[in-house]
Each structure stands twice: as structure tokens, then as C-alpha cells.
UniProtKB/Swiss-Prot annotation:
Organism: Streptococcus equi subsp. equi (strain 4047)
Protein name in the entry: Small ribosomal subunit protein bS6
InterPro entries: Ribosomal_bS6 (IPR000529), Ribosomal_bS6_sf (IPR035980), Ribosomal_S6_plastid/chlpt (IPR020814), Transl_elong_EF1B/ribsomal_bS6 (IPR014717)
GO molecular function, one term: structural constituent of ribosome
Superkingdom, natural source: Bacteria
Function: Binds together with bS18 to 16S ribosomal RNA.
Keyword tags: Ribonucleoprotein, Ribosomal protein, RNA-binding, rRNA-binding
PANTHER family: MITOCHONDRIAL 28S RIBOSOMAL PROTEIN S6, SMALL RIBOSOMAL SUBUNIT PROTEIN BS6M
A Pfam match: Ribosomal_S6
Family stated for the protein in its record: Belongs to the bacterial ribosomal protein bS6 family.
GO cellular component, one term: ribonucleoprotein complex
GO biological process annotation, one example: translation
């Protein structure tokens, strides 16, 4: 299984319950498509290098996971581009 890290930035003015629901939804998207989540945690609220969608800060969330193929990653990528609560995301394959 290959190891991956996903970092995504959530808009800063989201309510705590909505943020938790968003994180749970995207975690379930990954697990439903065959990935195994090793760790999913909030990093911190950070200032952005440049303004994104009129926001100067964002809530960073990190997910470490293992996957045998790219199905879960492709679905996460597709749905996170559509979702207005996620400002940016990045998927990185970690060295074995």
C-alpha cells in the first residue's frame, strides 16, 4: 500500500459543527473508496500567503492515509474542488 498525505484548507468562518461534519464526510469518502486513514487531525488556523476567496486565514487539516490505488484520491480531489468550504487542497505521495 502506498502512503499519502492530504492537506486541505477550510474556510475560517465555518461553524465548529459544520467543520466536524465536513471532516467526517471527507474522511468517509476516502474510506468508502478503499483507503485506510492512519491519522486525521486539525493542524491550526494559519494566515494565508495570499488571499483566497476573500479570506486571509484558513483552518488547516491533515490526513495521513494508505491506499492501494488512486480511486479514493481521485474522488476526494473531485469532490473537494466542488465544495465551497474547502479553499485549497494538496495530495502528496510519501516515500515508502
Amino acid at each position: 500500500m502506498a502512503k499519502y498525505e492530504i492537506l486541505y484548507i477550510i474556510r475560517p468562518n465555518i461553524e465548529e459543527e459544520a467543520k466536524n461534519a465536513l471532516v467526517a464526510r471527507f474522511d468517509s469518502i476516502l474510506t468508502d473508496n478503499g483507503a485506510t486513514i492512519v491519522e486525521s487531525k486539525d493542524w491550526e488556523k494559519r494566515r494565508l500567503a495570499y488571499e483566497i476567496n476573500d479570506f486571509r486565514e484558513g483552518l488547516y487539516h491533515i490526513v495521513n492515509l494508505e491506499a492501494t490505488d488512486a480511486v479514493a484520491l481521485n474522488e476526494f480531489d473531485r469532490l473537494s474542488k466542488i465544495n465551497g468550504d474547502i479553499l485549497r487542497h494538496m495530495i502528496v505521495k510519501l516515500d515508502a
